[in-house]
Swiss-Prot record:
A GO cellular-component term linked to this record: plasma membrane
GO biological process: lipoprotein localization to outer membrane; protein localization to outer membrane
Taxonomic path: Bacteria, Pseudomonadati, Pseudomonadota, Gammaproteobacteria, Lysobacterales
Organism: Xylella fastidiosa (strain Temecula1 / ATCC 700964)
Complexes and interactors: The complex is composed of two ATP-binding proteins (LolD) and two transmembrane proteins (LolC and LolE).
Membrane topology: Peripheral membrane protein
Family: Belongs to the ABC transporter superfamily. Lipoprotein translocase (TC 3.A.1.125) family.
Gene Ontology MF, one: transmembrane transporter activity
Identification of the protein by name: Lipoprotein-releasing system ATP-binding protein LolD
Keyword Lipid metabolism: no
Amino acid sequence: MNERSTPQALTGPVIRAESLGKTYSEGKLLTQVFDGLDLQVMRGETVAIVGASGAGKSTLLHLLGGLDVPTAGEVYVAGQRMSALSDGDRGRLRNKTLGFIYQFHHLLPEFTALENVMMPVLLSGQSVCSAKMRAQMLLEAVELGHRLNHKPSELSGGERQRAAVARALANSPDCVLGDEPTGNLDNRTASTVFELMLELNRAQRTSLVLVTHDRGLARCLDRVLELYQGGLRELTSAEV
């Protein structure tokens, strides 16, 4: 795993899960995904979540991001208990505090790269001018300054994913949640996008929580947690 230490100047968890439980029901059949799961992600920390297919990695990420609700336990984001917030307040907290990157970029096809990255800033209530300046700066940071006015269909797979990284950072979030963000890319492009995320983590002190099946990428992060039998266990360097 990465030998750089977790930043000491930034204290306190940006995300905390306490005794988290999640059960799905299908007719009379109950499927328990988590039971009593605990997790803390500190500010500026990078965390990989690994585990077998079907273990619930994506479900956990959705719970941490307030996109789904737990059956038991609580999730706190920036110190706020998600279950105590209205849908509107939860959405505003997500937009301000969290960024999301998925395996597929989810860029809106009818808008340019610049417009896609501007949207979270506009939704936060900032002016068009501010949103444009922020989006342009981020797209230049991910080496897409020459592709601002291109729509997703005019970008390569790697370029689309880099635009998605820029969009995730649009509101300077405390934490970015990534669900296999490089899983749909070839090895070379995946490595480029991953290194970009780490560079932005170092520059902006944004925490990263990445679900990945790639143990090589996981080793580059501060901690590697394995989702196993409904809970999380931290892996040693030898186990990764």
